[in-house]
């Protein structure tokens, strides 16, 4: 009998009832909520006369609709209704939360780890597709729909069919200027957006071991972009060091760590599919089309049209086969999102910005993913570096990742973005999104177009 993967071990710990291969009832350790997918679920509870079963295992924050300038000036009627609903609901149902504008407020997938609520071994859900982010800590994390949000509120459980297992091994040492965002974009570009459908993906390898926790979160965050709603990594000393002294970790931290150390994949664990990618062969990535698989290494020509999806993407993006990333005329640069708005991301970007100024006729904004990140960045002077370079320094929120708040890319404009999705109209009606790393986005803001960060000096910040 083969050994177990970390996913097997966590799954087995949380099964309440049901047979493998069929829907199984799973216990939920942590339920994160935000203002967009929770209002209908709360109303469903009221209509049924139910309460939240475990408010102590639930945590809410405001992120999707939050303005990043004049944060209390919410003019969109739907956005304001959703924000007001969450504010009422967390009080009525006695749910721990980070108030809008409070010291801990931010994007839910950043606030969870920052407060220490995200921990190895936990089974985590949220009404948001990028909940796989939390898998970087050795947790099961995945997005759920509003009906499921209500089910978790009422029962602290969820029905799930155990997925197959995909192992992705990142090996080698990256070139200067290549980051974890490039790893995941390269993987998706090579294998497509359907690679992980029906699978949980586990990431291993010396290239993963070398990453910081924040860099690991970037990879797990984008698991959903190739069809896998769950991404997971084995916890290690970096995980434990990150969590130590966080507000919500177990009081007996060392005992918790002793347990967490057992939550790693056995050497003889079975996987249904295995893929290996040598990151030493990777270059900085830039997407040209309208899904994350439509990406190329910097300097590589955009591919020929293979099908109607490609044709539609080229038409929407106003690009042509044979062009390169250098041909893109950028009007906007966005540094932010739950993929790349952590302190380490801002530090990397600042290295390519310090002492320079953004290109004429270009708008560049920096949106830290949480209030603690914003404060930490300001403490070491990153805000001044960006402001002196002509960037806008905003308050935390999901911002320009999606067109649900005032931060939108104008129609027809091309935007270099550190977010996770480049779908049609994602950043605003007619907006043209190019996904890339914080380094590539920062350098592009200065040049007004994409340039090869491998050839650029890095300032000391």
From Swiss-Prot:
GO MF annotations in UniProt: 3-isopropylmalate dehydratase activity; 4 iron, 4 sulfur cluster binding; metal ion binding
Membrane spanning residue stretches: none
EC numbers, comma separated: 4.2.1.33
Example GO BP: L-leucine biosynthetic process
Pathway recorded for this protein: Amino-acid biosynthesis; L-leucine biosynthesis; L-leucine from 3-methyl-2-oxobutanoate: step 2/4
Positions that bind [4Fe-4S] cluster: 338, 398, 401
Entry similarity comment: Belongs to the aconitase/IPM isomerase family. LeuC type 1 subfamily.
Protein name: 3-isopropylmalate dehydratase large subunit
